[in-house]
Design a protein with these regions (language model features):
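Active-site-proximal segments of metal-dependent phosphoesterases and phosphodiesterases across multiple
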Residues: 114-126
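Structured helix-beta-strand junction loops
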Residues: 27, 52, 103, 143-144
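Residue-level recognition of the N-termini of beta-strands and the immediately preceding loop/turn
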Residues: 3, 145-146
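Structured beta-strand-rich core segments of catalytic domains in phosphoester-bond hydrolases
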Residues: 37-40, 44-117
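Short, flexible loop segments at the rims of nucleotide/cofactor-binding pockets, characterized by
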Residues: 7-13, 86-87, 124-127
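N-terminal, active-site-proximal structural segment of metallo-dependent hydrolase catalytic domains
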Residues: 1-54, 64-67, 95
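Glycosyltransferase catalytic domains, chiefly GT-A lineage
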Residues: 19-22, 28-34, 87, 91, ...
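A long, amphipathic alpha-helix that forms part
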Residues: 123-145
Length: 146
């Protein structure tokens, strides 16, 4: 089975929702990966997607980051966060990652850290996050769409 996947940095789902929904209609997208949704899970406009017959899953955060996936097919959640892999961090509250399975296809929606300025704590976080992502994808032994 084939299906059309698209990625869209929405830079605030509240501000871009009409554009996103219109774009989905015009392009007959089956699965959309959205980054920078910038909203908490409770405020994500899931009903708007459901009215268009999309299943939706999201990992939100107030004002920053946030990722979401809308699909015409069933979505099976795998995880919303990367393991730490002894990267000298205790927690990661940034909503940047969502791994799902749709029609037996593993799909990861992610919003990579910027890391500016370098050197500095944001840069260190980015490097650590990228190492964790690399370990996660390599250890899966499966094909992934990122």
């Amino acid at each position: 089975m084939s299906f059309k996947i698209a990625s869209f940095n929405v830079n605030s789902i509240k501000m871009r929702l009409p554009n996103v929904l219109s774009w989905l209609d015009k392009n007959n997208i089956d699965v959309i990966l959205m980054q920078e949704t910038k909203t908490m899970d409770d405020n994500f406009p899931s009903l708007d997607f459901k009215q268009k017959r999309y299943n939706v899953i999201f990992n939100g955060q107030k004002s920053y980051n946030g990722v979401a996936i809308a699909s015409k097919f069933e979505i099976n959640e795998i995880t919303r966060s990367l393991p730490f892999y002894n990267e000298n961090i205790d927690e990661d509250n940034q909503a940047r990652f969502l791994h799902v399975k749709i029609n037996d296809v593993n799909i990861i929606c992610l919003y990579l850290p910027n890391g500016n300025p370098a050197p500095g704590p944001k840069y260190d976080y980015k490097i650590s996050w990228m190492k964790r992502l690399t370990k996660y994808t390599v250890r899966r032994f499966i094909q992934l769409i990122l």
